Design a protein with these regions (language model features):
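C-terminal nucleotide
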Residues: 1-16, 20-22, 29-30, 40-87, ...
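Glycine-rich beta-strand-to-loop/alpha-helix junction loops that act as flexible
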Residues: 104-106, 284-289
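Glycine-rich, flexible N-terminal cofactor/catalytic loop recognition
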Residues: 36
Length: 317
C-alpha cells in the first residue's frame, strides 16, 4: 500500500452570494477550519463501513471523469490511471465535513483530487492572476458538476486556495483579506445547526426554473443582487451600519421570495430576527437544511433570543 502526502482541505462558508451568483452577482467565501478532509489509505475519521463507502463513491466518480477524458471534454489533464490504481488500493476521503450542510463537502473532495491527480496543475499560491484563477475555477466547476448538476466552481476553489476569495463577476476573482476579528467585539457572525441535511441539486433546479419566469428574474436582478453586493462591499470596508441595513433587506427577500430554501421550522425564527432587529438570518449555501448563517450587532442579545438553538460564533466585529 502506498504512502501519500496527506494534504488537508478545509470546509468553506459562502458568506454572501448564494443563488445570486448564478446570475453574475458578487460573492464572498471564506475557509472554515472547523471541518477538514484528507485523501488517505489510513482513515481516522471514518469507520470501516464509511471508508468502504467513500472508496466506492470515488470509483463511481472516476468513471464520470474517465468518460469526460474519453470524450475529450475535460478542461485539464488528469492522471486517471493513478486515481484508479489508488482506488483499487482502497484510498478514501477521510472527512469530518458534514454532507448536505452547505460547507463544501464536495468542494473539499474536488480540491483534494485536483491537487493529487491533476498534471501541470495550477498551484494554490497567493500570486495567481485573475486569468489563472478563472481557469482554475472552471476546471474545478467541471469536476464538481458530478455532485450538484451545476457548479460555479467557487466551493472547490476556496477549499483549494485556502484563503478568502471575492468574486466580482464571472470574469473577475480576487483573493481578499477578511476584516480583522475583534475578540471583544459586540457584533458577530454565527452559525445555527438546523439538525437536518439539505440537497443542493433539487433546490438549485427549483431556483433556475423559477428564474425562467420573467417577473422572478427581474426581482433577483433588481433586489437580491444589489442587496447581496452592498452587503459584501460594506462588510469588506468594515461599514457595519450599512451592512446591517442591507442584511435586513436581504434576509426579508430570502424569507419572502425564497422560503422553500429555508427549513419550515426555522421560518418563524427568521421572521423574529427581522422584526426584533436583534439578528438577521441568511442561507449558508443552498439551504434546505445544514447550517443557517446569522449576523448580529449584539451577540449576547442574540444568544438570549436564540437560547434554544446551538450557536457557533465564527467571526466577531
Amino acid at each position: 500500500m502506498k504512502n501519500i502526502p496527506e494534504s488537508k482541505f478545509n470546509s468553506k462558508i459562502l458568506l454572501f452570494g448564494e443563488y445570486s451568483l448564478i446570475y453574475d452577482s458578487m460573492a464572498l467565501s471564506i475557509p472554515f477550519e472547523s471541518f477538514e478532509g484528507t485523501l488517505t489509505f489510513s482513515p481516522v475519521k471514518l469507520n470501516n463501513e464509511q471508508a468502504k463507502e467513500s472508496t466506492a463513491h470515488m470509483a463511481q466518480y472516476a468513471e464520470y471523469l474517465k468518460n469526460l477524458i474519453q470524450a475529450g471534454e475535460l478542461k485539464f489533464v488528469l492522471d486517471i490511471d493513478a486515481f484508479e490504481e489508488d482506488i483499487a488500493q482502497g484510498i478514501v476521503f477521510d472527512s469530518s465535513i458534514p454532507q448536505g450542510y452547505g460547507v463544501g463537502s464536495s468542494g473539499a473532495l474536488v480540491a483534494a483530487l485536483y491537487e493529487k491527480y491533476a498534471i501541470e496543475k495550477i498551484p494554490n499560491t497567493a500570486e495567481l492572476g485573475n486569468s489563472q484563477l478563472i481557469k482554475l475555477k472552471e476546471a474545478l466547476a467541471q469536476m464538481e458538476c458530478y455532485f450538484h448538476g451545476k457548479s460555479s466552481g467557487l466551493d472547490p476553489l476556496i477549499c483549494y486556495m485556502k484563503r478568502p476569495m471575492l468574486i466580482n463577476n464571472k470574469q473577475s476573482i480576487d483573493a481578499v483579506g477578511m476584516p480583522e476579528t475583534n475578540i471583544n467585539g459586540k457584533g458577530g457572525i454565527f452559525l445555527i445547526d438546523t439538525g437536518m441535511t439539505g440537497e443542493t441539486q433539487p433546490l438549485v433546479n427549483l431556483f433556475v426554473e423559477k428564474c425562467k419566469e420573467e417577473g422572478f428574474l427581474h426581482v433577483i436582478k433588481d433586489e437580491l443582487i444589489p442587496f447581496n453586493n452592498n452587503c459584501i462591499k460594506s462588510f469588506l470596508k468594515g461599514e457595519v451600519k450599512d451592512m446591517f441595513s442591507n442584511l435586513k433587506e436581504l434576509s426579508k427577500f430570502l424569507l419572502g421570495r425564497m422560503s422553500p430554501m429555508i427549513p419550515r421550522k426555522f421560518r418563524q425564527l427568521w421572521k423574529q430576527g427581522i422584526e426584533t432587529e436583534s439578528y438577521y438570518l441568511k442561507l449558508c449555501g443552498s439551504g434546505g437544511g445544514g447550517f443557517i448563517l446569522g449576523f448580529t450587532e449584539d451577540i449576547e442579545k442574540a444568544k438570549i433570543e436564540l437560547k434554544d438553538y446551538h450557536i457557533d460564533v465564527i467571526h466577531r466585529f
